[in-house]
Amino acid sequence: MDFIIQNFNEFLTFTGFANASAGNLIMILVGALFIWLAIKKDFEPLLLVPIGLGIILGNIPFRADAGLEIGLYEDYSVLNIFYQGVKQGWYPPLVFLGIGAMTDFSALISNPKLILIGAAAQFGIFGAYMVALALGFEPNQAAGIAITGGADGPTAIFLSSKLSPNLMGAIAVCAYSYMALVPVIQPPLMRLLTTKKERVIKMKPARQVSQTEKILFPIIGLLLTTFIVPSGLPLLGMLFFGNLLKESGKTTRLAKTASSSLNDIVVILLGLTVGCSTQASEFLTLNTIKIFALGALAFIIASASGILFVKLMNLFLPKGKKLNPLIGNAGVSAVPMSARISNNLGLEYDRHNFLLMHAMGPNVAGVIGSAVAAGALLGFFN
């Protein structure tokens, strides 16, 4: 009997009840909140459901010295093997492959000046970088935090895994949170920075883009961007490769796989492992609060920069060629959420003013811009 009691008591020390902390319970509630927002409020469910469940999974308490090989940071555990894709930077380029295979760059090709809006939105990244330095973060940490201004989760993970791996969980959750909150953050800012007259500007329909142009774009884009920032090659190379698969007309099956099955698998593993990395002991710190505050600042600056840059461009454009400033918010790389916001807000003020295709130009330019910015920061600090 004593043997049974002793073994039962030993068993109890392995349970989550015996090892739980207040931090674990708080993070489990955070994970549940993410899942609730995804399912009930439809806030990017494809991202927030895996991340939310990952947060819960990563904060299930267990005895660390038991050698069970179940924790994210325990060598040879299943979660640790999955996590290598985040830690070593494998998942983000594969996500970019899928994005490239899904994306139609016609809006940007037909109106190349829209790429300037995507470039202007990157001011949010460099503005947040300066503020992060002022708050006492190391330069490499500040760079990893600042990239959240692009609202681009894969880019944020890729850069932070190289420059600030100790902050990667908080940075990744921050980036994906602001991607999900695009419909909440951007519309009030767009109304604040534009007049009613500007919101009803009608833009001319984009010209038809030839198949030859669509094929040449990823090749020329790859050469131009990677010659400027070779360190962005893993992201930019896969983005343009995916787009070439889509546009070549001869690799449809590969493009479908990259944009559907492969992309879905990578997003599942990426979201789950990023969520698991937010363990209470590392996540519930003052630095996390600073990161979320800086992420919000970076995202607001990026969105505002795009809108204000369109207003600046309009000062030099002839009357019939002016741009609607509502497409300026789409300069961030939250594709296609920001472009949808531009379109929806435009329809509020003129139900015949469809801005979606116009907004997709700066939106896809923002994807390229954030990858270039990440490459520049990575090259600078390496």
Regions found by a protein language model. Name each.
Residues 1-74:
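N-terminal alpha-helical transmembrane segments of multi-pass membrane transport
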Residues 16-27, 80-95, 141-149, 176, ...:
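Structural signature of hydrophobic alpha-helical transmembrane segments
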Residues 39-48, 81-82, 102-117, 251-259, ...:
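Interfacial helix-loop-helix linkers and transmembrane-helix boundary segments
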Residues 88-89, 96-102, 117-127, 131, ...:
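Alpha-helical membrane segments and immediately flanking helix-loop junctions
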Residues 107-129, 281-307, 359-363:
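Entry/N-cap segments of selected transmembrane alpha helices
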Residues 166-184, 292-302, 326-327:
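Alpha-helical transmembrane segments
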Residues 177-250:
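Membrane-embedded hairpin module used as a gating/binding unit in multi-pass transport
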Residues 225-310:
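Transmembrane helical segments that form the transport core of multi-pass membrane transport proteins
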